[in-house]
């Protein structure tokens, strides 16, 4: 392979130092103990209702959640929390945190994102504390998961674009994991769904980086209703 034939490596990737990469991979790994395995974001009801019953329908459901639902909204909140933390603008950070918490569509989804946000902050501070992080956390009543990731990432100097891609990959992987247990799907089919969603994750991240808080909105009514109906689902494996 000649130099001209080699895949292009962006400056952002080459400039990411090894400690930052190590932390990013650790924080957004399935092994990082935020309890994501216990939540399905309403997918359990979607399977119960027959909206999701195979790899293709799971891919379609998650694609819409990424582009028009909580995936995009949470991505924007992450970016703005990261930006406020970088600037040391605690008032702005508090506003973003409050808006993000208010935007959650159901009680169980509120539990899901606040519990994971709290766990993420506590564990990251215990193992990798950073100047200014304690003060930022103390000024916010509660941080939902994407806001917590944005704040911690900014405190450690990790670029928002890389942090955002890693976050969306982690969230999407967790959704697929829930779907694979519920439908069920095999490991190969699950990875095919993840591969098919790669361009969707990338496009969502690109949109979110340049989006304002006024651009936030959701059109995933079926997914929001699923998260509400899950609260009274008779038999269930997940907490949301």
Curated annotation (Swiss-Prot):
Record GO cellular component, one term: cytoplasm
Keywords tagged on the record: Chaperone, Cytoplasm, Nickel insertion
Chief site of localization: cytoplasm
Domain of life of the native organism: Bacteria
Gene Ontology molecular functions: nickel cation binding
InterPro entries per UniProt: UreF, UreF_sf
Localization: Cytoplasm
Gene3D superfamilies in alphabetical order: Urease accessory protein UreF (1.10.4190.10)
Pfam families for the chain: UreF
Presence of the UniProt keyword Membrane in the record: no
Record note on quaternary structure: UreD, UreF and UreG form a complex that acts as a GTP-hydrolysis-dependent molecular chaperone, activating the urease apoprotein by helping to assemble the nickel containing metallocenter of UreC. The UreE protein probably delivers the nickel.
Family listed: Belongs to the UreF family.
Function: Required for maturation of urease via the functional incorporation of the urease nickel metallocenter.
Protein name: Urease accessory protein UreF
Organism: Bradyrhizobium sp. (strain BTAi1 / ATCC BAA-1182)
UniProt gene name: ureF
